[in-house]
Design a protein with these regions (language model features):
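Active-site nucleophile/metal-coordination loop of metallo-enzymes that catalyze phosphate/sulfate
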Residues: 2-7, 19-148, 156, 160-162
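Beta-strand elements within well-structured catalytic alpha/beta cores of enzymes
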Residues: 8-21, 42-43, 237, 245-249, ...
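Generic, well-ordered alpha-helical scaffold segments in large soluble proteins
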Residues: 46, 223, 227-231, 282, ...
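Short secondary-structure junctions
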Residues: 49-52, 142-152, 271-272, 288-295
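Glycine-rich, mobile lid/loop segments that gate access to catalytic sites or pores
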Residues: 120-247, 252-255
């Protein structure tokens, strides 16, 4: 049932990462500059121009916190659940307050444990990702027998890791992924060079629970490296000349389900969304938006059709 704002209709398109950088293969233009975009050009000419600072000046936020901000949700570091939790929710993973959820990348290390590909080739066969995840789950045993881990591959190189212990765990720990730091509880990309290695997870506060959480993450990293080194799947990939899935870079820890005002309550309108990625599904679940799927990642015509159709019953998509 539509609200008092029933006449309002909004199709809200977020072009995540569209800015990009100039590239020599396209005459040092950005992909957006090089592309033929007559419809976007017309919208721009007839629209209003401005700058939106979604998180903070000079901060390149990850998609989760950026989307929340663009939808009007401003988190302080004590409030935000962490992207690991958002993606865990988006995958339907069994997660409860006190669990530690982290997002990660399958990555490739050389024989000196230097990261040579942060995404292990990026396009990873679903079967391989599922198989190595299952190997880790079956073979990894923490020193505390009451601790356990679940590893869920999502899309391409992406993976979710959930660690559960007899005690509630803390998100106040550093990333093992050297390309991302934590600023006020949010993941922020760092300017990094080559020859990076997996970083040791450290507690961000002097508490037993933060130290325990960091220790469990480090134990996961150390033991999963050994399992992946002997992995049947990696031996097969090596024989096929493919990038090895021989490490997981972890970041954005969280330990609680986010509690926020639903988006329909916030704006007194009916909201829906078109989602593809686990982080988008997680955001829609947290904000209680009706979610539509519309083809694959690049099926834009189908997405436009679904968006137009949704305007019959929704205020915004």
């Amino acid at each position: 049932m539509l609200t008092d704002n029933s006449q309002i209709r909004i199709i809200y398109v977020l072009l995540d990462g569209v800015g990009d950088l100039p590239h020599p293969d396209i005459e040092n233009k950005t992909p957006l500059q090089a592309a033929k975009t007559p419809n976007m050009d017309k919208l721009a000419k007839n629209g209003k121009m401005g700058e939106v600072i979604s998180v903070g000046k000079g901060i390149a936020p990850e998609s989760d916190i950026a989307v929340f901000n663009m939808l009007g949700y401003k988190f302080h570091h004590t409030d935000y659940a962490g992207r690991g939790v958002i993606e865990a929710i988006g995958t339907g993973l069994d997660f409860k307050d006190g669990d530690l959820a982290l997002r990660g990348n399958f990555s490739t290390l050389d024989e000196k444990n230097v990261i040579i590909d942060r995404r292990a080739g990026r396009h990873i066969e679903r079967e391989d990702a599922k198989a190595v995840s299952k190997e880790i789950e079956q073979k990894l045993k923490f020193s505390n027998p009451l601790a356990s881990v679940v590893v869920v591959p999502t899309i391409g190189h992406r993976v979710i890791v959930r660690i559960r212990d007899e005690h509630p765990l803390s998100p106040n720990i550093t990333n093992t992924d050297p390309a991302y730091s934590r600023v006020d509880g949010m993941g922020v990309a760092k300017a990094v060079g080559d020859f990076l290695k997996i970083e040791r997870c450290l507690p961000l506060e002097d508490t037993d629970v933060a130290k325990l959480s960091a220790d469990l993450v480090n134990e996961f990293t150390e033991k999963s490296l050994k399992i992946l080194k002997e992995s049947v799947i990696n031996k097969k990939r090596k024989s096929q000349g493919k990038k090895l899935l021989n490490s997981i870079l972890l970041r954005d820890a969280g330990n609680k389900y986010p509690k926020v005002e639903t988006i329909n309550e916030k704006y007194s309108m009916n909201f829906s969304c078109i989602v593809d990625m686990p982080v988008e599904i997680g955001i829609s679940n947290v904000l209680e938006m009706r979610a539509y799927s519309a083809g694959g990642l690049t099926d834009y015509e189908e997405k436009a059709t679904v968006a137009a159709k949704s305007m019959e019953t929704e205020n915004a998509i």
